[in-house]
Amino acid sequence: MRDYIVRATAYNNKILAIAAFSTQTAQKAKEIHNLTPTTCAALGRALTAVAMMRVMMKGEKDKVTLVIKGDGPIGNIVVVSNYPGIVKGYVGNPTVDLPLSEKGKLDVGKAVGKNGYVTVIKDIGLKEPYVGTVELQTGEIGEDIAYYFYTSEQVPSAVGVGVLVGKEGNVLASGGFIIQLLPNIEEEVVAKVEEALKNISSVTELLRKGYLPEDILNHILGEMGLNILERVDLKYECDCSQERFETAIIALGKEEIKKLIAEGQSVEAVCHFCGKKYLIEESRLKELLRIAEE
């Protein structure tokens, strides 16, 4: 089944709701980066979150990057969505694998760590992108992003993301939701939403039962006039190119390019997001130097 995201509102547009089914997306990330069950769960959660965050943005050319930097062994988690429904990402140490937590679940929180930061970079076409940074709370990713929304954007939010990994290490199911309460919402409605959220043991449990994005939102907001606005296909896709890496070489400046030429070797670049290798020969480096000198 294809991956997709649903965007909806409820209670006369006073509740914004997003839900995602991201199984193939998480599986592709697992295959590209050769992830362990623990790192697959961590990156899969982050990819699901950034995909939902991008769908919440209005401009066609808007971009969002989510960076999670904790003190755990996984290192940095970087995920990007430059287009609606298109995501890519990587983790600093993809080989980390930890024992299950006390609850018998993949220990993403321990892999990420609790000391560190969540940074969200939103590029909406202005001179400078919006950058918001908050401290990590649990390292479980969902709670950390909810804390970001509340602290940095002043929007009370509930965020749930989960990845179910099988015994063979493949992704059985992946998905998540974001529920946001907009200004001037009545207290009794807030209480209803909170009660509905309390009845969810975990996102992975809903996914295990076969819930799709519409089912998840109905489960939480079904009695509050849920209104589905759009469905967006979701996939893992990298937009790297030879041209982009050559632009990065030019940005190093002419002195650095001269050093590369003096070494008399080709330059090999590897994309962090998809592992694709790009080779820039010495003759091409000289051409890039001429461009840098212009």
From Swiss-Prot:
Pfam families reported in the protein's UniProt record: HSP33 (PF01430)
Record PTM text: Under oxidizing conditions two disulfide bonds are formed involving the reactive cysteines. Under reducing conditions zinc is bound to the reactive cysteines and the protein is inactive.
Highest taxon of source: Bacteria
Coiled coil: none
Gene Ontology CC: cytoplasm
Listed Gene3D superfamilies: Hsp33 domain, HSP33 redox switch-like
Gene Ontology process terms (BP): protein refolding
Cysteine pairs bridged by disulfides in the record: 238-240, 271-274
The entry's keywords: Chaperone, Cytoplasm, Disulfide bond, Redox-active center, Zinc
InterPro entries: Heat_shock_Hsp33, Heat_shock_Hsp33_C, Heat_shock_Hsp33_N
GO MF assignments: protein folding chaperone; unfolded protein binding
Compartment list: Cytoplasm
Chain's role: Redox regulated molecular chaperone. Protects both thermally unfolding and oxidatively damaged proteins from irreversible aggregation. Plays an important role in the bacterial defense system toward oxidative stress.
Family that this chain belongs to: Belongs to the HSP33 family.
Protein name as annotated: 33 kDa chaperonin
Organism: Thermoanaerobacter pseudethanolicus (strain ATCC 33223 / 39E)
